[in-house]
């Protein structure tokens, strides 16, 4: 009696050449088939399992609008070119990412899939396809430490241009140095970014705005230096400039001119007596006995102060004990009552010296006015550029949709 073995389930392997496979349209490589052909596992029910390993390359659109806080979506579409849905039915399964190795530049967010059917004019049957969307988020730690943070620090250094004194001679040098540094970082960004004109990257917008701020700071610095080193012979400050800068802007910035808070001289009223400790002269001295020192001191003592003469002093607050009209008459061409030629010559010399000092005082006043205007412009630009820099930094960088997520995950 013979015994027969009945196998209810068995499987064997076949070469891929012995089986029919469908032509798919998921390849975007220079080679048409990027898979490695392995044997097909066939069981007794006719089920065939074919798992060829392969590297699939796909062409996808890269959106650099939010670089380096961008999220990219690449689609992998699997379908058949030769067989429709009546001959070949594609079913979608979830993508297995258990063997995914983390990357230092990208984070794999997910691979969602979607099955769709498409109808063509030539055929009545549908053509199914399965599309997997690979969603990746760029890790921003590298770009933040090497590009963003240095750019923020350099833009902060640009504000120091307005704090540097004009007499140092380094305001223009500092501004140009900061501008060149930003240009170097801009070139680094251009090397990293793909050559596309579809959109302006976020980091390029930030660098461009920072370079505009630094460039304007250099222009303003030139104006400030022109104000600070203004030639007094070039004319006085225009009225509108004086009103805007020295009055309105100075009041808004709480700035005061040098010497504005000084204590006023002691002799201000008619009834107050004034005397100079360094000048002691006798009122009984006759006019012919006067010398050049007396007249010089009488003119340059305290200019512009009018006081009532004291009975025991011939000099009051730096002026002679005579009326202002009499002083001006002597210093502006008037002849002394005695007609002494020596005294006339002395008065002529005193008149020249007085005019010289008066011109020097006027030149110093004009220079001081222009220098104060330069300080006001510096302070005003420091405030305005600081606010503009903060607004640009926060507004541009935080406009990225996943800015908070990127900072919390990459910089934590």
From Swiss-Prot:
Coarse class of the protein's main subcellular location: membrane
NCBIfam families in alphabetical order: LIC (TIGR00860)
The family annotation for this protein states: Belongs to the ligand-gated ion channel (TC 1.A.9) family.
Q: Which CDD domains match?
A: LGIC_TM_cation (cd19051)
Stored InterPro entries:
Neur_chan_lig-bd, Neur_chan_lig-bd_sf, Neur_channel, Neuro-gated_channel_TM_sf, Neuro_actylchol_rec, Neurotrans-gated_channel_TM, Neurotransmitter_ion_chnl_CS
Topology class, membrane: Multi-pass membrane protein
- Matching PROSITE patterns: NEUROTR_ION_CHANNEL
Q: Where in the cell is it found?
A: Membrane
List this protein's GO terms for biological process.
Answer: chemical synaptic transmission; monoatomic ion transmembrane transport; regulation of membrane potential
Q: Which UniProt keywords apply?
A: Membrane, Transmembrane, Transmembrane helix
- Official protein name in the record: CHRNA7-FAM7A fusion protein
For this protein, the record's PANTHER family field holds: NEUROTRANSMITTER GATED ION CHANNEL (PTHR18945)
Which tissues carry this protein?
Expressed in hippocampus.
Keyword field contains Zinc-finger: no
Which superkingdom does the taxonomy of this entry point to? Eukaryota
Residue intervals passing through the bilayer: 144-164, 172-192, 205-225, 240-254, 380-400
Encoding gene, per UniProt annotation = CHRFAM7A
**What is an example of a GO molecular function annotated in this UniProt entry?**
transmembrane signaling receptor activity
What would be one Gene Ontology cellular-component term for the protein?
Answer: acetylcholine-gated channel complex
Keyword Cell cycle set for record: no
